[in-house]
């Protein structure tokens, strides 16, 4: 398309002052460089938007394209290391990094990535002198006290390291109910229970065996990362490591067994720091505290057990960052967007329901592929780049749509939706909130799609050729290649569920797995992205571990890795803006020119208001009142993947 710039616009361009081109003096320190970079990014963002508007080039005014035009604009890239994705973001959809991220946080991140060190920059990461956990926690507390009034950094917001009990079994376990990855804890299978029972007998753990025999059915759960090697294309006993970027790092595939009491206390019982295909080939350690009420053990000094818990959370970092967050929200939603743009006309009701939940996702994902994964994730992970990319591709290809619908997912993992408000599950706030949010969103979608104007019966869905084309595009090897997407959608209920799922991924699910990262991950000892010393090869070796062994596993001598581990969660956890939350979406929907959407939007707004009150109660019922669970509160819930 040719864009003509009027004479008056050209004169305006000649006379305009471009603040982002002003020559600034060489910075004298980190804070000065950060201030200059942040101001420059913000000015550039505003100037670029203004220039586009006055030149009438891809302006901020919405444009409508025909289905053929969209098909031509949205093409697949199928030949790089990533799952199928958009080849090139169309100019009218392209959003710059400074418009997506906080300019200050982005500038901080770029300074860290580019290794532009200044004398006072070293304060953002500890050094070898912080060689005990007590020194590390004191350092973290002091950094939070030292925040200036102008330039804020990753220590401006609280993190888990400010808790005196951050390392305890209670706080460790609760992270799998209300932390960044609360989506994968699963009822232990008979196979796992048999394996742990046999190992407990071999190690003479009589109290553990007695608990296995006396506990009610469905009392044991696992966080299971044992399939990492298979999914990454590694051999069962292959050592997982990454020696790029000048720092040797190790990955692990841990398994943690938990006991969930009838009153809802989740307690870790046993850990395999790195599962290598069988229990015999792996190391298994049992908790000295079989009973969660046992206070006879000094948890602070139980270094073998603390090391094992660190392995679990490091494994969880990998699953969360690469799969639960990146793949299962960002990349999967991009496939939905591209397929819908190619096969659904702008006036199609499904397209109209989904489009508001896309916003900056395509530009954000392009940045992730070009920068975040190769320049951040790979340099701090404990797995090689080929293993990481294989892990992501495998997860994308095998993404199981219907089994991940919220009610089905919770049921399959051992959390019956009709029992979520019982004492046993009262601490699983993610499950309680996300299930109610799914029900609310499904009600909204259903009230629109089931209207007689759109799909009065199943036959009207089965006869919709564009819906069938969308299914084909999602499954095709020349499209998204997601063969677990339905081969066809032929009933109203099936369509309602799928549209609800697409909104769920973009809004509540992404919010749940993204916005808690700063709190749980900027304090690196809680959840390191990798281990910086080899893992133990026998239980005898692990049982001899002292504090120095755990400290050696942390990146105290790898400052860049520490900084990236801490900074990226801070970059990605910026507070959701009011115009980006689900409440504003409902308000906008309530004034839609389509009366059906408007009516549904008004009901959605009312339902969200009720949910806000319910979620406050759910958080107040948590045993742990030190860290509220409010990430899914409607006013904090992002309407789309905006960061």
Swiss-Prot record:
Q: Which PANTHER family match?
A: LIPOXYGENASE
**Any GO MF annotation of the entry:** linoleate 13S-lipoxygenase activity
Read off the Gene3D superfamilies from this record.
3.10.450.60, Lipoxygenase-1, Domain 5 (1.20.245.10)
Entry-linked InterPro entries: LipOase, LipOase_C, LipOase_C_sf
The entry's biotechnology remark is:
The oxidation of primary substrates may lead to co-oxidation of other molecules. Cleaves piperine to piperonal and 3,4-methylenedioxycinnamaldehyde. Converts (+)-valencene to (+)-nootkatone, alpha-nootkatol and beta-nootkatol. Converts trans-anethole to p-methoxybenzaldehyde. Converts trans-isomethyleugenol to veratraldehyde. Converts alpha-methylstyrene to acetophenone.
Name the encoding gene, please.
Answer: LOX1
Q: What is this protein called?
A: Manganese lipoxygenase
So what family is this one in?
Belongs to the lipoxygenase family.
Lipoxygenase domain boundaries: 166-643
| Stated pH dependence | Optimum pH is 7.0.
Which prosthetic group or cofactor does it need? Mn(2+)
Give the UniProt record's GO annotations in the biological process aspect.
linoleic acid metabolic process; lipid oxidation
Entry's cofactor comment? Three His residues, the carboxyl oxygen of the C-terminal Ile or Val residue, and a fifth residue, usually Asn, ligate the metal, which binds water to form a catalytic base Mn(2+)OH(2) for hydrogen abstraction.
Residues recorded as binding Mn(2+), renumbered to this chain, are 325, 330, 510, 514, 643
Source domain of life is: Eukaryota
EC number(s) from the headed UniProt entry: 1.13.11.12
Q: Which UniProt keywords apply?
A: Dioxygenase, Manganese, Metal-binding, Oxidoreductase
Q: How does activity depend on temperature?
A: Optimum temperature is 37 degrees Celsius. Optimum temperature is 35 degrees Celsius.
A Pfam family annotated for this UniProt entry:
Lipoxygenase
Which segments does the entry list as coiled coil? none
Q: Which reaction does it catalyse?
A: (9Z,12Z)-octadecadienoate + O2 = (13S)-hydroperoxy-(9Z,11E)-octadecadienoate
Q: Where is the signal peptide?
A: none
Described function? Lipoxygenase that metabolizes linoleic and alpha-linolenic acids to 13S-hydroperoxy fatty acids.
């Amino acid at each position: 398309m040719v864009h003509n710039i009027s004479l008056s616009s050209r004169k305006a361009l000649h006379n305009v002052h471009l603040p982002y081109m002003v020559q600034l003096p060489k910075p004298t320190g980190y804070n000065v460089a950060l201030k200059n970079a942040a101001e420059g990014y913000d000015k550039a963002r505003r100037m670029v938007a203004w220039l586009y508007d006055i030149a009438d080039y891809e302006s901020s005014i919405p444009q409508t394209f025909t289905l053929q035009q969209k098909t031509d604009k949205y093409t697949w890239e199928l030949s790089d290391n990533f799952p199928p994705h958009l080849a090139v973001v169309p100019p009218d959809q392209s959003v710059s990094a400074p418009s997506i991220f906080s300019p200050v946080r982005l500038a901080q991140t770029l300074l860290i990535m580019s290794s532009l060190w200044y004398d006072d920059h070293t304060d953002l990461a500890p050094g070898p002198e912080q060689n005990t956990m007590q020194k590390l926690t004191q350092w973290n507390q002091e950094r939070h006290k030292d925040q200036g009034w102008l330039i804020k950094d990753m220590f401006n917001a609280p993190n888990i390291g400010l808790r005196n009990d951050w390392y305890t079994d209670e706080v460790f376990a609760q992270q799998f109910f209300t932390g960044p990855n609360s989506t994968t804890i699963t009822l232990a299978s008979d196979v796992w229970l048999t394996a742990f029972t046999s190992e407990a007998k071999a190690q003479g753990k009589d109290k553990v065996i007695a608990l296995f025999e006396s506990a009610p059915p469905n009392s044991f759960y696992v966080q299971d990362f044992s399939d990492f090697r298979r999914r990454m294309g590694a051999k069962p006993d292959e050592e997982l490591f990454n020696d790029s970027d000048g720092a040797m790092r190790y990955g692990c595939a841990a398994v943690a067994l938990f006991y969930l009491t009838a009153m809802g206390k989740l307690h870790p019982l046993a850990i395999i720091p790195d599962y290598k295909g069988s229990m015999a080939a792996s190391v298994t350690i049992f908790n000295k505290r079989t009973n969660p009420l046992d206070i006879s053990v000094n948890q602070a000094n139980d270094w073998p057990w603390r090391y094992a818990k660190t392995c679990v959370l490091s494994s969880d970092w990998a699953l969360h960052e690469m799969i639960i967050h990146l793949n299962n929200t960002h990349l999967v939603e991009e496939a939905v967007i591209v397929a819908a743009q190619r096969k659904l006309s702008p006036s199609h009701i499904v397209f109209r329901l989904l489009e508001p939940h896309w916003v900056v996702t395509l530009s954000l994902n392009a940045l992730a592929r070009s920068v975040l994964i190769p320049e951040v994730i790979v340099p701090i992970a404990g797995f090689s780049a080929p293993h990481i990319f294989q892990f992501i591709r495998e997860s994308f290809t095998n993404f199981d749509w219907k089994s991940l619908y919220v009610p089905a997912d919770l049921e399959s993992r051992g959390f019956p939706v009709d029992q979520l408000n019982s004492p046993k599950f009262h601490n699983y706030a993610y499950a309680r909130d996300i299930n109610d949010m799914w029900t609310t969103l499904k009600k909204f979608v259903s009230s629109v799609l089931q209207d007689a104007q759109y799909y009065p019966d199943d036959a009207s869905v089965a006869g919709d050729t564009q819906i069938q084309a969308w299914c084909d595009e999602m499954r095709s090897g020349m499209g998204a290649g997601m063969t677990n997407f339905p081969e066809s959608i032929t009933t109203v209920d099936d369509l309602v569920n799928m549209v609800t799922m697409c909104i769920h991924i973009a809004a509540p699910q992404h919010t749940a797995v993204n916005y808690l990262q700063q709190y749980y991950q900027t304090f690196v000892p809680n959840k390191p992205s990798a281990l910086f010393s080899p893992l133990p090869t026998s239980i005898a070796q692990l049982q001899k571990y002292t504090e120095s062994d755990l400290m050696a596993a942390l990146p105290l001598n790898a400052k860049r890795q520490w900084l990236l581990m801490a900074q990226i969660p801070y970059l990605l956890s910026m507070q959701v803006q009011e115009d980006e939350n689900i409440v504003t979406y409902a308000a906008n929907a309530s004034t839609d020119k389509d009366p059906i959407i408007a009516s549904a939007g008004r009901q959605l707004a009312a339902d969200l208001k009720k949910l806000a009150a319910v979620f406050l109660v759910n958080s107040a019922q948590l045993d742990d009142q030190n860290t509220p669970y409010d990430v899914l509160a409607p006013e904090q819930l992002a309407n789309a993947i905006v960061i």
